[in-house]
Amino acid sequence: MKLKNFLTSLFLVFFTFSVNAEELKIRDQNTEFNVYTGMFDFSDDGKKSTLLGFQHQNENLNRDTFLGNLSPITGALVTADAAGYFYTGVQAQYKLGALNFTPSFTPGLYFEGDGKDLGHIIEFKSELQFSLDLSNTSELGFSYNHLSNASLGDKNPGANSYMFNFLKNF
């Protein structure tokens, strides 16, 4: 009798942990990394430059609003001219089947390096991204953004950029 109770208890413990482990696996898919490359300020022939960037999104912190589902993002980009932009902000994601439309807004800090003088250290990035689901955890996309200091500085030339994105959920 004791052996039967022990085996039943042991089975329940292992069954409970295995069910919980599956829940944790599903819940762990809430972190998204976006690696992208493209052309910084493609519309200015004198100052355009190749860029490389990385962005992190944590969907555990998302919120449903009247604008849709919003989640925080943080990232950085560097250009071949040693300019850099470090940012944090918010993005929304709208799904149309396998196609995703993702607008975002991120204030950040811009460091000129040998690149374009944007007029101020504080810059605001507005971005539109379109991506296609490759699998449940991967997307391939294209995005366009504009950096501007919103006239905080004496000059506000702005910069238009395009990027090719690879997004992966973990």
Question: Which residues make up each language-model segment?
Answer:
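Transmembrane beta-strand segments that form the barrel wall of outer-membrane beta-barrel proteins
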Residues: E32-D41, L67-T79, T102-L109, S143-S148
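Helix-adjacent hinge/juxtasegments
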Residues: D81-F105
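Short loop/turn motifs that connect adjacent beta-strands in outer-membrane beta-barrel proteins
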Residues: A21-N30, D44-D45, N60-L70, K95-F101, ...
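Residue-level signature of outer-membrane beta-barrel architecture
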Residues: H56-N58, A92-Y94, L132, H146, ...
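Cleavable N-terminal export/targeting peptides
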Residues: M1-D28
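Outer-membrane beta-barrel "beta-signal"
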Residues: K48-F54, L132, P157-F170
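Solvent-exposed loop/turn segments connecting transmembrane beta-strands
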Residues: F40-T50, A76-Y87, D114-I121, S151-A159
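Mid-chain, well-packed structural core segment of small domains
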Residues: L99-E127
